[in-house]
């Protein structure tokens, strides 16, 4: 998809779909004010509200409302922007858009207003993505994290780190010009120390971005275990509703069941699965295959065992969970144990029926979801998978640069620093291909 042209004027409905009290049509581009004049809004002044009747080509009134002009470059897109605020009737809003197109505008593509804001330097790529994340936020915590990303909290940290890597690269490339001199005499120790500090900063930024990604996307947690361990009962207890069928018959669950729950503003998707065991009929075996497939994309495995027979339960699971990096072992049905029974100290003892241990389970889930410091949200920002991937590449190149410096391979070290800087530039859009930009903005809402 090609990037937006600043010579055209675009139009779209900017308010939410459906019927509402107020509807907004947004224009952006060089003809915005001229089109507004043809609609019947004459002598507009920037940043003043003008009451007007919006008319069609025959002079008939389409609607009446308020018109606002945000003159370039003092607007969201950096261009002349006119917003027409009328009644929230989809029929009237579509008619108003059609009239603007008759007057020379064209229908905006999804995300094209934000794309123009990016191209005109009003915000960087991470901030533009934060707009979509703010709109789609499912809870207050995610919304606040997206707001911080939109305010530039994430971008500023990325830019500061990129600047540090640039300075280090300048020192390394300067040393290349004096190849006959030992690196230490050219400030090599300071470069290594500086790179070490930059790697620490990068590692922390990566951890924070991963946490921000979880805030945006939520966590995929798979309930896994042998039949009749109480996985479905536990899902119902955590969800607060009878989402899964529960019986005393082993193998009741044959398919996967997804249920999203909120943990203090964090979304956790629980996946109930078929119990793992040897044998079973064809349908049950297919259910077990799907359970293992869910584990392959799980962020967290909730291993549910019957506390009355832990060894047999562990044997039934086998190596199914080995591929999941994070696991939480849950000993269910603890209410059926005698007082003398002892459980693994690293596991959580719960009863899905009585509710015993569920509060502790919630606490552990929060900690696993967001890591250390889950109660400190002041610095949280939203992030996306591509941001995390870019930071990981930057970390790999920074580590490689440190290794090459140790061998005094200055040309290779300089190249690794360049690649680390390039990976960071992809986050903010300073170094992004047009096809990547097009893919990102096409996922936005129309009118944004």
UniProtKB/Swiss-Prot annotation:
Q: Which residues form the TrmE-type G domain?
A: 218-370
Which positions bind Mg(2+)? 232, 253
**Any note on cofactor binding?**
Binds 1 potassium ion per subunit.
Cellular component, GO, one term: cytosol
| Short name of one Pfam family | TrmE_N
Identify a single GO molecular function assigned to this protein. metal ion binding
Enzyme category, top tier: hydrolase
Residues that coordinate or bind GTP: 228-233, 247-253, 272-275
Gene3D superfamilies in the record: P-loop containing nucleotide triphosphate hydrolases, Probable tRNA modification gtpase trme, domain 1, tRNA modification GTPase MnmE domain 2
Q: What is its EC number?
A: 3.6.-.-
| Binding positions for (6S)-5-formyl-5,6,7,8-tetrahydrofolate per the UniProt entry | 26, 83, 122, 448
- Cytoplasm in keyword set: yes
Looking up InterPro entries in the UniProt record yields: G_TrmE, GTP-bd, GTP-bd_TrmE_N, GTPase_MnmE, MnmE_dom2, MnmE_helical, P-loop_NTPase, Small_GTP-bd
PANTHER family reported in the protein's UniProt record: TRNA MODIFICATION GTPASE GTPBP3, TRNA MODIFICATION GTPASE GTPBP3, MITOCHONDRIAL
Family, per entry? Belongs to the TRAFAC class TrmE-Era-EngA-EngB-Septin-like GTPase superfamily. TrmE GTPase family.
**Xref: NCBIfam families:** mnmE_trmE_thdF (TIGR00450), PRK05291.1-3 (NF003661), small_GTP (TIGR00231)
Q: How does it assemble?
A: Homodimer. Heterotetramer of two MnmE and two MnmG subunits.
Q: What's its job?
A: Exhibits a very high intrinsic GTPase hydrolysis rate. Involved in the addition of a carboxymethylaminomethyl (cmnm) group at the wobble position (U34) of certain tRNAs, forming tRNA-cmnm(5)s(2)U34.
Return the protein name: tRNA modification GTPase MnmE
* Source species of the chain: Xanthomonas axonopodis pv. citri (strain 306)
């Amino acid at each position: 998809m090609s990037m937006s042209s600043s010579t055209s004027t675009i139009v779209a409905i900017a308010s939410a779909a459906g019927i509402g009290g107020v509807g907004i049509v947004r224009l952006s581009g060089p003809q915005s004010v001229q089109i507004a004049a043809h609609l019947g809004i004459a002598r507009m002044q920037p940043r003043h509200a003008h009451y007007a009747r919006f008319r069609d080509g025959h002079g008939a009134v389409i609607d009446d409302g308020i018109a606002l002009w945000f003159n370039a470059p003092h607007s969201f897109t950096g261009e002349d922007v006119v917003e027409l605020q009328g009644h929230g009737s989809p029929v009237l809003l579509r008619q108003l858009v059609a009239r603007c197109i008759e007057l020379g505008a064209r229908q905006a593509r999804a995300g094209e207003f934000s794309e123009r804001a990016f191209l005109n330097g009003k915000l960087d790529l991470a901030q533009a993505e934060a707009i979509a994340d703010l709109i789609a936020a499912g809870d207050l915590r995610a919304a606040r994290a997206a707001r911080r990303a939109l305010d530039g909290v994430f971008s500023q940290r990325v830019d500061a780190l990129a600047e540090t890597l640039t300075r280090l690269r300048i020192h390394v490339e300067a040393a290349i010009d004096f190849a006959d001199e030992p690196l230490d005499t050219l400030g090599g120790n300071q470069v290594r120390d500086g790179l070490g500090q930059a790697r620490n900063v990068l590692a922390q930024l990566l951890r924070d971005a991963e946490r921000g990604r979880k805030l945006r996307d939520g966590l995929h947690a798979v309930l896994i275990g042998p039949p009749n361990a109480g996985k479905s009962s536990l899902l119902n207890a955590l969800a607060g509703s009878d989402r899964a069928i529960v019986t005393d018959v082993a193998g009741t669950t044959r398919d996967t069941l997804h249920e999203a729950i909120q943990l203090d503003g964090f979304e956790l998707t629980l996946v109930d699965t078929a119990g793992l065991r040897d044998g079973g009929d064809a349908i049950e075996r297919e259910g077990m295959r799907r359970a293992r497939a869910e584990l392959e994309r799980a962020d967290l495995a909730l291993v549910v065992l019957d506390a009355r027979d832990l060894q047999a339960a562990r044997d039934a699971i086998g190596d199914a969970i080995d591929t999941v990096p994070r696991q939480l072992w849950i000993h269910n049905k603890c209410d059926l144990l005698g007082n003398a029974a002892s459980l693994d100290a690293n596991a959580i003892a719960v009863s899905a029926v009585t509710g015993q241990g569920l509060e502790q389970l919630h606490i552990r889930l929060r900690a696993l979801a967001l890591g250390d410091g889950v109660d400190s949200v002041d610095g949280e920002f939203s992030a996306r998978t591509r941001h995390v991937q870019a930071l990981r590449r930057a970390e790999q190149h920074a580590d490689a640069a440190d290794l090459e410096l140790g061998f005094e391979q200055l040309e290779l070290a300089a190249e690794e620093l360049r690649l680390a800087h390039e990976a960071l530039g992809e986050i903010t859009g300073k170094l992004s291909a047009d096809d990547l930009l097009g893919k990102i903005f096409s996922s936005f809402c129309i009118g944004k």
